[in-house]
């Protein structure tokens, strides 16, 4: 989730999930106090730092391939432009966006946490309950956020997917769902 070393000081003492062991107790998967060291691609962050320090008037563009959320406070302040892709886009399309030939239309498919403490505070079984990163321009990197040439994307997709997070248990009538979707 981030490049630099981090110790999980605010993680739960006891994990929410865990398999039942042979003796009937639940496995504790807590990572409280565990230190994650620099990631193997830490050199990417160092290259970005170098580019930021030496680019002058040339915009620094970051194209980030992602498989999960990340903590952006190490990256966003160093970049003029951030493009997120999920390993499914063709590289020529990413180049076309950078060159201004194709307008970006994508939305974030998961929340981007403000920091690791927000990740640790998240309830794994509650969707979209995380405090999200807000960049220098005031954009919050929440689920279904995206920018195009005109600014923040506001279309049918964002109306559909920007619903308020579920914060309490809701009942679900499966029979009614089945009947409505036949």
Language-model features: where?
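C-terminal non-catalytic regions of proteins with extracellular/luminal or membrane-system context
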Residues: 1-182
